[in-house]
Every structure is written in structure tokens, then in C-alpha cells.
């Protein structure tokens, strides 16, 4: 089981789709060696060094958190059903209302669209919010994603810089 890493007052909560088998086995988010999450958030400016998956709790020191739309682990995220994503979206809204981070970064367009009943989503900041929490849709850092490391870092850095500009 991969536990959420959440606390009140965070700058951002990164929301993955669901745990991969490697993450579920190890008990840490984004634990597969091919997953680029830890490298990307470091290079984008969220952390001052590249954390290891087993150091995930240290994200709180950087005012960052991690959650997921669906708890069920799978080999690939495309094994998660639309129904699971939609139910996960409802649960995610409750978590965000409870913790009220400045931003929620959903990692993947399809996850966002199915979890929140949206269509035609563009990358970046979205027009709707959860209370005062901005919603951002960022490319998924999975090793299966065809998005280059450079593009991932650029997208995540845009969120980090937006928070910095707001004094966060």
C-alpha cells in the first residue's frame, strides 16, 4: 500500500493516477526506477536535491505532498477503469478541501478528464479550482510516457514559478 503524504498548508500536492506494482511492493510513491518524478521535481525547483522514493516523507519539508486518484495498483495506468477514476476524483476533492494546498497538480490529462468529467484539457493551470486551490494538469512522469525529460521539467517548473510569483 502506498500512503498519501499530505499535511495542511502545502504549496502543492502532486496527484498520480495509481500506484504501479513496484510502488505498491516497496510502499513508496513513484518507486519504479524508470519513473522520472523525483528527477523532474528536483530539476523543476521543488526540492534542493533529488530525493529517493524511500525519502518521500521528506517532501513535506519542501511543502509538497503526494496522493493518487486510485488506490489499486496495476502494471500500467491504462488498466484503471473510468469508473475508478471518477470515484477517485470525488475522493480527491474531499482530500483537497480538507488540506487546502495552494495547488493540486494532476499528473496526466486523461486522469484529469475522467476523474473530473472534463473535456479538451490543455496542459498547465486550469480554470476551475477546488476552493482556493488551483488545479494544474501536468504530463505524467512515468517511464512509459513519451514526453521528454526536458518537456516534463519545463511543465513542472511553470507551476513552481507560478507559486514563487505568488510568494509561496
Curated annotation (Swiss-Prot):
Q: Identify a single GO molecular function assigned to this protein.
A: pyrimidine-specific mismatch base pair DNA N-glycosylase activity
Q: Which InterPro entries match?
A: MUG/TDG, MUG_bact, Uracil-DNA_glycosylase-like, Uracil-DNA_glycosylase-like_sf
Check the record and name the Pfam families matching this protein: UDG
Q: Where in the cell is it found?
A: Cytoplasm
One GO BP: base-excision repair, AP site formation
Q: Which CDD domains match?
A: UDG-F2_TDG_MUG (cd10028)
The Enzyme Commission number assigned here is: 3.2.2.28
Q: Kindly give the SUPFAM superfamilies that the UniProt entry links to this protein.
A: Uracil-DNA glycosylase-like
Q: Can you state which reaction this protein catalyses?
A: Specifically hydrolyzes mismatched double-stranded DNA and polynucleotides, releasing free uracil
Enzyme kind, highest EC tier: hydrolase
Coiled coil: which residue ranges? none
* Keyword annotations: Cytoplasm, DNA damage, DNA excision, DNA repair, DNA-binding, Hydrolase
Q: Name one GO cellular component term.
A: cytoplasm
Q: What does this protein do?
A: Excises ethenocytosine and uracil, which can arise by alkylation or deamination of cytosine, respectively, from the corresponding mispairs with guanine in ds-DNA. It is capable of hydrolyzing the carbon-nitrogen bond between the sugar-phosphate backbone of the DNA and the mispaired base. The complementary strand guanine functions in substrate recognition. Required for DNA damage lesion repair in stationary-phase cells.
Family statement drawn from the similarity comment of this UniProt entry = Belongs to the uracil-DNA glycosylase (UDG) superfamily. TDG/mug family.
Q: How does it assemble?
A: Binds DNA as a monomer.
**Entry protein name:** G/U mismatch-specific DNA glycosylase
Amino acid at each position: 500500500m502506498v500512503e498519501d503524504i499530505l499535511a495542511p498548508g502545502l504549496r502543492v500536492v502532486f496527484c498520480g493516477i495509481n500506484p504501479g506494482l513496484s510502488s505498491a511492493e516497496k510502499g513508496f510513491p513513484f518507486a519504479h526506477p524508470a519513473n522520472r518524478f523525483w528527477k523532474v521535481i528536483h530539476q523543476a525547483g521543488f526540492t534542493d536535491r533529488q530525493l529517493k522514493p524511500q525519502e518521500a516523507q521528506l517532501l513535506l519539508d519542501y511543502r509538497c505532498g503526494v496522493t493518487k486518484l486510485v488506490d489499486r495498483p496495476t502494471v500500467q495506468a491504462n488498466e484503471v477503469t473510468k469508473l475508478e477514476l471518477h470515484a477517485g476524483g470525488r475522493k480527491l476533492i474531499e482530500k483537497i478541501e480538507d488540506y487546502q494546498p495552494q495547488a493540486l497538480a494532476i499528473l496526466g490529462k486523461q486522469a484529469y478528464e475522467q476523474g473530473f468529467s472534463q473535456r479538451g484539457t490543455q496542459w498547465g493551470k486550469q480554470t476551475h479550482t477546488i476552493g482556493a486551490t488551483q488545479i494544474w494538469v501536468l504530463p505524467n512522469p512515468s517511464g512509459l510516457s513519451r514526453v521528454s525529460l526536458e518537456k516534463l521539467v519545463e511543465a513542472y517548473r511553470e507551476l513552481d514559478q507560478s507559486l514563487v510569483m505568488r510568494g509561496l
